[in-house]
Swiss-Prot record:
This is Large ribosomal subunit protein bL27. SUPFAM superfamilies: Ribosomal L27 protein-like (SSF110324). It holds the Pfam family Ribosomal_L27. PANTHER family: LARGE RIBOSOMAL SUBUNIT PROTEIN BL27M, RIBOSOMAL PROTEIN L27. Residues 1-21 are annotated as: Disordered. GO terms for cellular component: cytosolic large ribosomal subunit. InterPro entries: Ribosomal_bL27, Ribosomal_bL27_CS. Belongs to the bacterial ribosomal protein bL27 family. GO terms for molecular function: structural constituent of ribosome. One of its GO terms (biological process) is translation. Gene3D superfamilies: 2.40.50.100.
């Protein structure tokens, strides 16, 4: 009588889906109002001129223009602004 005992269970076998975070529009690119510039967790980038910040810290353009990245302030924070053309 050939028998195989139960193999037991494992605590592995899960993985979350990728969240597609990151910069969507880079410096110098022309954007329209409402365009998403960065999807992020927390404020790695801060909203500058003509940029809004969503509930999930997504940065988006509030005016048409070119994307500009800048580092300023005593803590060297990264700001994203839209410069009108």
């Amino acid at each position: 009588m050939a028998h195989k005992k139960a193999g037991g269970s494992t605590r592995n076998g899960r993985d979350s889906n990728a969240k597609r975070l990151g910069v969507k529009r880079f410096g110098g690119e022309t954007v329209l109002a409402g365009s998403i510039i960065v999807r992020q967790r927390g404020t790695k980038f801060h909203a500058g001129n003509n940029v809004g910040c969503g509930r999930d810290h997504t940065l988006f353009a509030t005016a048409n223009g070119k994307v500009q990245f800048e580092v300023k302030g005593p803590n060297n924070r990264k700001y994203i602004s839209i410069v009108a053309e």
